[in-house]
């Protein structure tokens, strides 16, 4: 199993990720396509695990649960059995990672993806493991009531596009957005990166005034 923890999230200009327990903006096909591609891409003969909180699970339309082609794990400290459709229940992110490393699943899983919500993102982004963060930046303010914390992103730097690739702003339904990738910056992870992916500082994308 890949030791890196992968996170995928969409944020508005103030790092908002939710409003009234729903996605704050209309569904963006390009973002949904990228989410599906990221979380399903895996080594032959394996699957990825997607880990989410109970509210995130319930926010997925019933007809789309579980997320197809992925091992769905729901986190809850109050439930005693997995919610209908979920494959596994875990009490914490650590417990979910332990499940992924268990004899039952270790040979089946390629990557572990964290897909929400806010508290789980914070735990994932500030934990001791290597992290790669795939972020959709929605270039509008949607007056959200759930946010990614700036503190949890302080250790992250943006990965430069590869030669020949160009940052692109997409537009759907009058909404502009773009895709970005970040890594947790440590001495070992920074020096291990090839020059073409040398990270750049996370500011201004994660600044208080963004």
From Swiss-Prot:
It is an enzyme of class 1 (oxidoreductase). It catalyses: (6S)-5,6,7,8-tetrahydrofolate + NADP(+) = 7,8-dihydrofolate + NADPH + H(+). Its EC number is 1.5.1.3. Pfam families: DHFR_1. GO terms for biological process: dihydrofolate metabolic process; folic acid metabolic process; tetrahydrofolate biosynthetic process. GO terms for molecular function: dihydrofolate reductase activity; NADP binding. Keywords: NADP, Oxidoreductase. Residues 4-184 form the DHFR domain. InterPro entries: DHFR, DHFR-like_dom_sf, DHFR_CS, DHFR_dom. The keyword NADP applies. The keyword NADP applies. Belongs to the dihydrofolate reductase family. This is Putative Dihydrofolate reductase. It comes from Human herpesvirus 8 type P (isolate GK18). The gene is ORF2.
